[in-house]
Amino acid sequence: MALSGGDDQVPPGGPMTVSTRLIDAGSTIMQRRLPVKQMNTHVSTFAIYGGDMSRLIGTHHYVHRVNDEFLQCAVYASDRSDAPLIGIEYVISDRLYETLSEDEQKLWHSHAYEVKSGSWAYPRLPEVVAAPELKNIAKTYGKFWCTWQIDRGDKLPMGAPELMMSPQGVGQGVLRPELVKRRDEKYNISTDDLKHTRAEIAEPEWINPMADYWKQHGKCFVLDIATVEMNRHAQFP
Protein backbone atom coordinates (compact mmCIF):
# COMPACT_ATOMS: atom_id res chain seq x y z
CA MET A 1 0.00 0.00 0.00
CA ALA A 2 1.57 3.29 -1.07
CA LEU A 3 0.90 6.44 0.86
CA SER A 4 2.46 9.66 -0.33
CA GLY A 5 2.26 13.30 0.53
CA GLY A 6 5.22 14.18 -1.69
CA ASP A 7 7.03 16.38 0.83
CA ASP A 8 10.49 14.81 0.45
CA GLN A 9 10.86 14.40 -3.30
CA VAL A 10 13.80 16.30 -4.77
CA PRO A 11 14.75 15.63 -8.41
CA PRO A 12 18.43 15.18 -9.29
CA GLY A 13 20.40 18.12 -10.63
CA GLY A 14 22.94 20.72 -9.63
CA PRO A 15 22.12 23.91 -7.74
CA MET A 16 21.06 26.99 -9.67
CA THR A 17 23.89 29.21 -10.84
CA VAL A 18 24.03 32.99 -10.72
CA SER A 19 23.16 33.19 -14.42
CA THR A 20 20.05 31.03 -14.10
CA ARG A 21 18.92 33.05 -11.09
CA LEU A 22 19.38 36.24 -13.12
CA ILE A 23 17.28 34.80 -15.95
CA ASP A 24 14.52 33.90 -13.50
CA ALA A 25 14.66 37.32 -11.85
CA GLY A 26 14.56 39.11 -15.20
CA SER A 27 11.68 36.98 -16.40
CA THR A 28 9.72 37.77 -13.25
CA ILE A 29 10.07 41.48 -13.93
CA MET A 30 9.76 41.59 -17.72
CA GLN A 31 7.48 38.74 -18.76
CA ARG A 32 3.76 38.23 -18.39
CA ARG A 33 2.65 34.93 -16.89
CA LEU A 34 -1.07 35.31 -17.41
CA PRO A 35 -2.08 31.61 -17.49
CA VAL A 36 -0.23 30.87 -14.25
CA LYS A 37 -1.68 33.90 -12.51
CA GLN A 38 -5.18 32.56 -13.12
CA MET A 39 -4.57 29.68 -10.69
CA ASN A 40 -6.38 31.22 -7.75
CA THR A 41 -7.60 28.26 -5.69
CA HIS A 42 -5.74 25.52 -3.80
CA VAL A 43 -7.49 22.18 -3.27
CA SER A 44 -6.10 19.39 -1.10
CA THR A 45 -7.54 15.98 -1.95
CA PHE A 46 -6.59 12.39 -2.75
CA ALA A 47 -6.34 10.16 -5.82
CA ILE A 48 -5.92 6.48 -6.64
CA TYR A 49 -4.01 4.95 -9.54
CA GLY A 50 -6.52 3.37 -11.89
CA GLY A 51 -4.12 0.56 -12.76
CA ASP A 52 -3.12 -0.19 -9.15
CA MET A 53 -5.73 0.77 -6.62
CA SER A 54 -3.49 -0.12 -3.69
CA ARG A 55 -1.70 3.18 -4.37
CA LEU A 56 -3.41 6.21 -2.85
CA ILE A 57 -1.70 9.62 -2.94
CA GLY A 58 -2.34 13.06 -1.54
CA THR A 59 -2.59 15.77 -4.19
CA HIS A 60 -2.61 19.55 -4.35
CA HIS A 61 -4.63 21.07 -7.16
CA TYR A 62 -4.03 24.67 -8.19
CA VAL A 63 -7.15 25.64 -10.06
CA HIS A 64 -7.71 27.95 -13.02
CA ARG A 65 -11.41 28.60 -13.55
CA VAL A 66 -11.85 29.05 -17.31
CA ASN A 67 -15.61 29.47 -16.89
CA ASP A 68 -18.38 28.20 -14.63
CA GLU A 69 -18.37 24.77 -16.28
CA PHE A 70 -14.68 24.15 -16.96
CA LEU A 71 -11.71 24.16 -14.58
CA GLN A 72 -8.14 23.19 -15.34
CA CYS A 73 -5.76 22.22 -12.56
CA ALA A 74 -2.01 21.88 -12.20
CA VAL A 75 -1.52 19.03 -9.72
CA TYR A 76 1.44 19.08 -7.35
CA ALA A 77 2.70 16.62 -4.76
CA SER A 78 2.67 19.25 -2.01
CA ASP A 79 2.07 22.94 -1.43
CA ARG A 80 5.75 23.83 -1.11
CA SER A 81 7.42 26.22 -3.52
CA ASP A 82 9.63 23.38 -4.82
CA ALA A 83 6.81 20.84 -5.08
CA PRO A 84 6.99 18.40 -8.01
CA LEU A 85 4.37 18.93 -10.70
CA ILE A 86 2.84 15.45 -10.95
CA GLY A 87 -0.05 15.87 -13.36
CA ILE A 88 -3.06 17.75 -14.64
CA GLU A 89 -6.78 17.45 -14.03
CA TYR A 90 -9.66 18.86 -16.03
CA VAL A 91 -12.99 19.39 -14.26
CA ILE A 92 -16.25 19.81 -16.17
CA SER A 93 -19.90 20.27 -15.28
CA ASP A 94 -22.38 17.42 -15.47
CA ARG A 95 -23.95 19.12 -18.48
CA LEU A 96 -20.67 19.06 -20.42
CA TYR A 97 -19.97 15.51 -19.32
CA GLU A 98 -23.22 14.31 -20.88
CA THR A 99 -22.05 15.66 -24.26
CA LEU A 100 -19.07 13.26 -24.31
CA SER A 101 -19.03 9.90 -26.07
CA GLU A 102 -19.31 6.81 -23.87
CA ASP A 103 -15.69 5.87 -24.58
CA GLU A 104 -14.58 9.29 -23.37
CA GLN A 105 -16.89 9.25 -20.35
CA LYS A 106 -15.14 6.11 -19.09
CA LEU A 107 -11.97 8.13 -18.45
CA TRP A 108 -13.63 10.51 -16.00
CA HIS A 109 -14.51 10.24 -12.32
CA SER A 110 -17.24 11.87 -10.24
CA HIS A 111 -16.56 14.31 -7.39
CA ALA A 112 -19.65 13.89 -5.23
CA TYR A 113 -18.02 11.47 -2.79
CA GLU A 114 -14.85 13.59 -2.50
CA VAL A 115 -16.96 16.57 -1.48
CA LYS A 116 -19.40 14.78 0.82
CA SER A 117 -16.70 12.75 2.58
CA GLY A 118 -14.60 15.83 3.37
CA SER A 119 -11.60 14.62 1.39
CA TRP A 120 -11.89 17.59 -1.01
CA ALA A 121 -10.68 20.51 1.13
CA TYR A 122 -9.66 24.12 0.64
CA PRO A 123 -6.72 24.70 3.03
CA ARG A 124 -6.99 27.87 5.12
CA LEU A 125 -10.26 28.85 3.44
CA PRO A 126 -13.24 29.00 5.82
CA GLU A 127 -15.84 26.36 5.05
CA VAL A 128 -18.57 29.00 4.92
CA VAL A 129 -16.69 30.71 2.08
CA ALA A 130 -16.12 27.43 0.23
CA ALA A 131 -19.71 26.19 0.61
CA PRO A 132 -21.13 27.59 -2.68
CA GLU A 133 -18.23 26.16 -4.65
CA LEU A 134 -18.56 22.78 -2.95
CA LYS A 135 -22.17 22.54 -4.08
CA ASN A 136 -21.01 23.03 -7.66
CA ILE A 137 -18.02 20.68 -7.44
CA ALA A 138 -20.23 17.87 -6.11
CA LYS A 139 -21.92 17.78 -9.52
CA THR A 140 -18.76 17.80 -11.62
CA TYR A 141 -16.56 15.17 -13.24
CA GLY A 142 -12.77 15.12 -13.49
CA LYS A 143 -10.10 13.57 -15.72
CA PHE A 144 -6.73 13.37 -13.98
CA TRP A 145 -3.53 12.21 -15.65
CA CYS A 146 -0.54 11.60 -13.38
CA THR A 147 2.77 12.18 -15.18
CA TRP A 148 5.21 11.69 -12.28
CA GLN A 149 4.82 8.75 -9.91
CA ILE A 150 6.84 10.05 -7.00
CA ASP A 151 5.12 7.70 -4.57
CA ARG A 152 7.07 4.78 -6.05
CA GLY A 153 10.33 6.72 -5.69
CA ASP A 154 10.73 8.06 -9.23
CA LYS A 155 13.24 10.92 -9.12
CA LEU A 156 12.20 12.00 -12.62
CA PRO A 157 8.95 11.62 -14.58
CA MET A 158 9.08 8.08 -15.96
CA GLY A 159 6.98 6.08 -18.40
CA ALA A 160 3.48 6.73 -19.67
CA PRO A 161 0.94 8.86 -17.80
CA GLU A 162 -1.42 7.06 -15.44
CA LEU A 163 -5.15 7.70 -15.33
CA MET A 164 -6.18 8.48 -11.76
CA MET A 165 -9.43 7.66 -10.01
CA SER A 166 -11.36 9.42 -7.27
CA PRO A 167 -11.67 7.81 -3.83
CA GLN A 168 -15.07 6.28 -3.15
CA GLY A 169 -16.69 4.76 -0.11
CA VAL A 170 -16.47 1.16 -1.28
CA GLY A 171 -13.86 -1.50 -1.99
CA GLN A 172 -10.37 -0.32 -2.86
CA GLY A 173 -11.64 3.23 -3.21
CA VAL A 174 -11.85 3.76 0.55
CA LEU A 175 -9.61 6.51 1.92
CA ARG A 176 -6.62 5.39 4.00
CA PRO A 177 -6.79 6.82 7.55
CA GLU A 178 -3.01 7.36 7.71
CA LEU A 179 -2.97 9.73 4.77
CA VAL A 180 -6.09 11.61 5.86
CA LYS A 181 -4.62 12.07 9.35
CA ARG A 182 -1.40 13.47 7.90
CA ARG A 183 -3.33 15.98 5.79
CA ASP A 184 -5.59 17.01 8.67
CA GLU A 185 -2.67 17.62 11.02
CA LYS A 186 -0.83 19.68 8.41
CA TYR A 187 -3.74 22.07 7.89
CA ASN A 188 -5.34 21.83 11.34
CA ILE A 189 -8.62 20.56 9.93
CA SER A 190 -10.85 17.56 10.58
CA THR A 191 -12.07 15.55 7.62
CA ASP A 192 -14.76 14.06 9.86
CA ASP A 193 -15.97 17.56 10.77
CA LEU A 194 -16.01 18.56 7.11
CA LYS A 195 -18.10 15.49 6.34
CA HIS A 196 -20.58 16.45 9.05
CA THR A 197 -20.71 20.08 7.90
CA ARG A 198 -21.40 19.03 4.31
CA ALA A 199 -24.25 16.67 5.14
CA GLU A 200 -26.74 19.19 3.73
CA ILE A 201 -24.99 19.48 0.37
CA ALA A 202 -27.25 17.82 -2.16
CA GLU A 203 -25.83 14.85 -4.01
CA PRO A 204 -26.36 14.72 -7.77
CA GLU A 205 -29.69 13.23 -8.75
CA TRP A 206 -27.80 10.91 -11.07
CA ILE A 207 -24.14 9.99 -11.52
CA ASN A 208 -23.48 8.63 -14.98
CA PRO A 209 -22.49 4.92 -14.70
CA MET A 210 -19.73 5.44 -17.27
CA ALA A 211 -17.87 7.53 -14.66
CA ASP A 212 -15.91 5.81 -11.88
CA TYR A 213 -15.63 2.91 -14.30
CA TRP A 214 -13.69 0.70 -11.91
CA LYS A 215 -16.49 0.96 -9.35
CA GLN A 216 -19.27 0.15 -11.80
CA HIS A 217 -17.52 -2.40 -14.00
CA GLY A 218 -14.43 -3.66 -12.16
CA LYS A 219 -12.08 -2.57 -14.95
CA CYS A 220 -9.51 0.18 -15.43
CA PHE A 221 -7.61 1.89 -18.22
CA VAL A 222 -3.82 2.05 -18.64
CA LEU A 223 -1.58 3.47 -21.35
CA ASP A 224 1.20 1.58 -23.11
CA ILE A 225 4.02 2.95 -25.22
CA ALA A 226 4.47 1.37 -28.64
CA THR A 227 6.79 2.02 -31.56
CA VAL A 228 4.88 2.89 -34.73
CA GLU A 229 5.72 4.11 -38.20
CA MET A 230 5.80 7.87 -38.60
CA ASN A 231 3.22 9.54 -40.80
CA ARG A 232 5.45 11.01 -43.49
CA HIS A 233 2.68 12.67 -45.46
CA ALA A 234 1.27 16.01 -44.47
CA GLN A 235 -2.46 16.05 -44.01
CA PHE A 236 -4.31 18.63 -46.05
CA PRO A 237 -7.02 20.69 -44.32
From Swiss-Prot:
InterPro entries according to UniProt: OBAP-like
Top-level taxon of the source organism: Eukaryota
Pfam families registered for this protein in UniProt: DUF1264 (PF06884)
Family (UniProt): Belongs to the OBAP family.
Protein name as annotated: Oil body-associated protein 2C
Source species of the chain: Arabidopsis thaliana
